[in-house]
Every structure is written in C-alpha cells, then in structure tokens.
Amino acid sequence: MPEYKAPLRDMRFLIDEVFDFHGRYQALGASDATPDMVAAILDEGSKFCEQVLAPLNRSGDEEGCHFDNGVVTTPKGFKEAYAQDVEGGWNGVASDPAYGGQGLPHSLGLLLSEMIGASNVSWGMYPGLTRGAMSAIHAHGSQAQKDLYLARMTAGTWTGTMCLTEPHCGTDLGIIKTRAVPNADGSHAISGTKIFISAGEHDLSENIVHLVLAKLPDAPAGTKGISLFIVPKFLPDAEGNVGARNAVSCGSIEHKMGIKASATCVMNFDGATGYLIGEPNKGLHCMFTMMNHARLGTGMQGLCLGETSYQGAVRYARERLQMRSLTGPKAPDKPADPIIVHPDVRRMLLTMKAFNEGNRALAYFTAQLLDTEHLSQDAAERERAADLLAFLTPICKAFMTETGQEVTNLGMQVYGGHGYIREWGMEQLVRDCRIAQIYEGTNGIQALDLLGRKVLGSQGKLLRGFTKLVHQLCQAQAEHPQLKGQVAQLAALNAQWGELTQQVGLAAMKNADEVGAASVDYLMFSGYVTLAYFWLRIALVAREKLDAGSGEAAFYEAKLATADFYFSRLLPRTAAHAAAIQAGAAGLMSLSAEQFSL
C-alpha cells in the first residue's frame, strides 16, 4: 500500500502564500484561528492520519464490514481509531462552541478532512457524514433538537446519516414511498426502506442519528411533498440518555467495488419514531444543507485518493528500473534507468501532480467562501460568497472526482502490471475513487445542476460572479513579463465560456434537450478553466518568490513547470469539450430506444 505522508509544504503554500488564510481569518474576526492553531492542526492531524488511520486502510479493505442478524461490525482497528478521534476532539474542530465545538473556521476543518480522506477514505466517512447531519440540524432544527443532538454529535459519541435513496428511486426523490404518520405526542411513525445508506449501522458510537426523507399523509405530489425527520437508533430522554431501541434496523450491507470498510446499509423503518425538522413538506430544502456539505466532501475524495496515488507512483517511478533513457543512460552504474526518466511516465506523473495541486487550490478557495458565508458581518459579502459557492459546488463535486479517477488510474498505470496486483495497493485507490462520481448526485446530475439551475437559471449571474474574478486577474497581469502567454490563454477561454453559455441558452429556448446534451461537456470545460485560474494564481506567487530570491527555488520552479504543463497539455482539452457543446442535441436524440440494439 502506498505510504501516505500529508503534503504539508503544499498545504502551507496555499494557506500562507496564495490564499492568506491568516489575513482572512483576522478580517472575519476568527481570532482563535491563529497561525499556531493552524500549525497544530496540520502537525497533530497529520500524525493521527499517518500513524493511526493509514495503517488501517488496506486491512480495512481486505476485511470489510461484517453483518450478523442486523449487527454491523467495522474492520479491526476502526473502533479504536474512532475512540482516538473522539478523545482528540477532532470531530468538533469547526463546530459551534455552543455545543462543544472549537468554533474554528470551516477551512481549518477541511484541512483535517483532506488528510483523513487521503489516509483512509472509508474510515473518514463515519465522522464526515456526522458533520453533514449536524449542519442540517444546526440550520433547520428547533432549539430543543439542537440541544439534544448537537453536543453529542460534536463530541462524536453519536454519529449521523442521511437516508434518501429507496430501491425504486435515487435521483428522483419526488417518488419516494417512505411515509410519516403523525402520532398523538407530536412525533411521527416512519415506515419504509432506504438503501445505500453509508454508516447506517456500525459499532463505533453509542447512538446513530438518521436524517430521513419521508412524506406526510396529506403531502403534495413530487418533491414539494417531502419532509425531513430525525430518527435516532436509540430514543433519548430529555437529558440525552440513551433509552429504548427505536424501530429502525439494518436489513443487510452491500458488497461493493470499493470503500469496503464503510458500511453501506439497507435500512428498514418499521413505524420508527421520528421528529420533524423544519416545516412540513420543506424537507428537501433542509436536506440540501447536508447534501451541499456532502458534495464538497465527495469532491475532496477525488483529491485525497489522487494524492495518495501520486505519492505511490512517484516513489515507484524513482525506484523501478526499466530500459534506458532515449537520450542515453541516466544511471549508467545500474542495469537500467529509473522509469521516471521516460517521457510517458513523466506525462502521467505531471498530469497527476497538476490535477492534485490545482484541485487542492480549488478546494481551499471554496472553503474560504464557506468561512465568509458563515462569519462575515457584511451582508453583501456573504451573498457574493454564497453565489460563488452555489456555482462552484457542482464543479468541485464532479470535476474533482472525474480528474481524481483519472489520477488514480494513471497511478496504477505507472506501476504497470504490479499496479493491477492487490498487494501494491494502487488498485484499491481506483476502486475506492470510483463511487465518488456516482453518489451524492451523479456527475451527470451535477452537470445539469451547474448549467441548468445555477447558470441558466440565474440568467448567467452566478457564472458572471466567477468569470469576473478571472477577468480581473487577467486584466491585471496582461503584461506580465514571464506569464503573459498563459494570461492571454486564460482570458480567451474565459470569454469563450460566456459565448458557449449564450449559445446553449439560445438553443435551449427551442429545445430543452440542448441543456442535457451540453451539460457534462459544459461542466468539464468549466472545470478546466476554473483550474487554470488557480494555476495562474499559483504561478504568479511562485514567480514572485523566485524573483525575490527565495531559498526554496526548487519548490517554486516545480510550481511554474507544473503550471506550464497544465496550460500546454491539459487546458487544450477545452477545445474538444467546446466542440461537443456546439454539436447540439440532435446527434444524441436521433436514435429511437429500439435502435439501441442488443
């Protein structure tokens, strides 16, 4: 299994030099988020991830979760690692101090989440889903619900889930069959079956708090009739003491391609006691608070697994001896040269490096927007941050997982035949990453959300909010002595972005299928241009540091070389996506269903 080491130098480069986290924390009044606090989270968090979680990654995949008559047991070592997580207070880093959290900015929580996901993504899903459930309760629950649930979930002694999918519906939640019948005491009896429920049952915590979508007896049809309920595994009393077992049980666990140490459960609700969150028939709105949290977390999985794969691939490429360099021996004292000297291996490694480091910048920028949305005292600034978040969330989820899958595949390819063998660990990263393109809304759905709802639905407002940032950067750096070529390339694509949007919008006025036909290519085009914006920002900082005579010349030179690779080798992929967007819907919709022959 590749040995994971947190990429602390690259993380600190973005935190301190590109995005100035400390300056932003001061502006937002986050006085506790000092440089020393950031350093402590990075240093202690990396030790926990490298020394405790990473060693459990392969064994967890090999063993998987065990199911026995409704009881789910996590792999060996998971429970002990979770106890250390609880003892360290890691689950509450960015949680509300009113409920026992440390109250630090969301961006600091993301740093920890990155290291957890890269060291053991399956383990990380248990506390990760809990934080998502907490966000929904915090935003929409009553004060009594917050008081009862949040402190225990913040501590980690209770965990959380979200229960949406049913056997007959995943994306189309408007046709769910789970029902909520009012009880005399104000609670509801929840009946139905949910599937694909991550962390639905396990042995890590004393209670599990399920957030369940269901319909009331008089609910309107479709998504306008969905309500959200808290359904605890054990019914707590008013003081939070765990009481009687609720009528919710795990019917089975799934046998999956990857993330095998994360329990994916079929959950049966047989008249279970549930408590309404928010208003009746407004459950989807409440759940999307959690879903947006989960989508950003899922995007991070692409980065996390890509980082671990890259680290393994680089080490292997430096050590594996095969053939001689085309330009002559580079290690004449050895029987062959290390494969890292070969151009195609370089292509793979640079692709991995460029996507990982670009995606990390995108993730950290997005995390800063979360900080602004939650902490800024300026209403207009909060609104701008919320708009940018709405626009970037589907890009983060879909583009980061699409490129993350490419990166893990390339990592396996660098190993050649050994990459296909389980004991090396590279194929596990491919398997674990694959689900990220599917759950929390498939990438096709993210593409529809981006183009249909976020861009066209806002009459272009959300797109303009981001392209304005790109335009301002390009305008300011148009005459940069070393980087003006990359600036011009980005400026041209930024303009084309608006033109493509207008073309699709006009075509969709005559045929709604034009949106669906263009959406995935539109999202990928958007992702490549978005990463180019961040790579330009990275390159500008690196160039400035080199010009100032930095003592870390090799680090900054590598940034410039990787930026050049991105602009010259990866960004041109936008041309293919633009051509596909302009091809329109006709080529996709001309065949009848019967003409898809078997």
Region annotations inferred by a language model:
Residues 25, 30-32, 62-74, 286-297, ...:
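Glycine-rich cofactor-pocket loops
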Residues 187, 191-245:
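A short core secondary-structure module
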Residues 65, 78, 126-130, 141-183, ...:
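Internal maturation/activation junctions in enzymes
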Residues 1-124, 148, 579, 583-598:
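Amphipathic, small/basic residue-rich leader segments at the start of a protein or domain
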Residues 196, 235-251, 256, 263-294, ...:
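A glycine-rich, basic-preceded beta-loop-alpha segment at the flavin cofactor/substrate interface
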Residues 131-133, 142-145, 442, 450-494:
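A structural-propensity feature for long, helix-poor, extended segments
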Residues 111, 457, 473-598:
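C-terminal amphipathic alpha-helical interaction region
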Residues 2-5, 259, 365, 387-465, ...:
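Alpha-helix capping/hinge segments and adjacent helical runs
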